[in-house]
Amino acid sequence: MSQHTSQYVFNSKEDYNVILDNMSREFEERWNHQTQSPYTNLENYITRAVLGNGSFGTVMLVREKSGKNYYAAKMMSKEDLVRLKQVAHVHNEKHVLNAARFPFLIYLVDSTKCFDYLYLILPLVNGGELFSYHRRVRKFNEKHARFYAAQVALALEYMHKMHLMYRDLKPENILLDQRGYIKITDFGFTKRVDGRTSTLCGTPEYLAPEIVQLRPYNKSVDWWAFGILVYEFVAGRSPFAIHNRDVILMYSKICICDYKMPSYFTSQLRSLVESLMQVDTSKRLGNSNDGSSDVKSHPWFQGVDWFGILNQEVTAPYQPTISGAEDLSNFENFEFKDRYKSRINRHPELFANF
Ligand SMILES: Nc1ncnc2c1ncn2[C@@H]1O[C@H](COP(=O)(O)OP(=O)(O)OP(=O)(O)O)[C@@H](O)[C@H]1O
């Protein structure tokens, strides 16, 4: 499996369209070529530390035994996945991670399983979550926000071109690498669909009105969430954040787009947020045939060196301090709890294709 996110150099708009077509062909090949993980547990790796705990598993720092490379191993209990009805999501996540290759997306390096757990081996991204960094500084200035937003817009453009709806955009799912560039992670809710779907999923603060109203929706829900994300970067809070997080009240505000624009937003940022957060999807920026180009050519992005960003030549506004692969200073301290150790293979039929 290739360990490179991109072997491409991005030079011009024409080249980029050709490159995206090539990426699309390569994506299709990998999408159609899924392999079953061997029952090798983590025997090819040495576990060094816990990087984080998600709702469905633990992410550990591991080092491969045959070399010196470090990775993040996402370990998920089969029992928990069945109990929490996440079986389809985990297959989905592996499928997408295996097929997608883009500079700002996490990808699958390897996968294994054992009687109790499934393991996804991912590139180690050790600058911590964008969420934690944002919480520390509270607000980004617009230039700083634009640096991250440009990468998210390019990643959404790629995913949509591959007919993937991401459906879980939020700062918690954006990791920072050593150079301060982003890697989007967590593809459990990502769905490959060319058109519309109607499953209710995502995180309340970022749900588009059509999802809240249980209406069929398309990839423009990601552009709505992108509007929320950019707003939150600069305002330091989500537009629909409500004291005590009354979700029903939040949903009623989302449906009528009832939020306040901070007075310090520039007119270009106001215009971007307003255009993305349109209840009427026919008016929502990003929802035309040439959707991502419309977003990228919005005046707020004027002056962005798109190819410099794609090639990661632009200096990031913040570079995490990392002294080595085992430096965990950008992560909170987590404890490891290995709850299951059975002699029987749990749910072999449900995870046969994992
Ligand atoms: N590739 C990685 N490199 C470094 N740390 C990672 C990596 N992937 C995940 N982590 C850390 O582990 C945490 C949990 O990972 P992840 O969000 O994938 O789990 P999850 O169970 O899907 O979580 P969620 O609760 O968001 O559904 C992340 O927030 C991050 O801090």
UniProtKB/Swiss-Prot annotation:
Annotated Protein kinase domain residues: 45-301
Cellular-component GO terms for this entry: cAMP-dependent protein kinase complex; cytosol; nucleotide-activated protein kinase complex; nucleus
Enzyme class: transferase
Reaction(s) this enzyme catalyzes, per UniProt: L-seryl-[protein] + ATP = O-phospho-L-seryl-[protein] + ADP + H(+); L-threonyl-[protein] + ATP = O-phospho-L-threonyl-[protein] + ADP + H(+)
Positions contributing to ATP binding: 51-59, 74
Active site: 168 (proton acceptor)
Molecular function GO labels: ATP binding; cAMP-dependent protein kinase activity; protein kinase A regulatory subunit binding; protein serine kinase activity; protein serine/threonine kinase activity
E.C. code: 2.7.11.1
UniProt keyword Thylakoid present: no
Official protein name in the record: cAMP-dependent protein kinase catalytic subunit 2
Naturally occurring in which organism (per UniProt): Drosophila melanogaster (Fruit fly)
Lineage: Eukaryota, Metazoa, Ecdysozoa, Arthropoda, Hexapoda
Primary gene name: Pka-C2
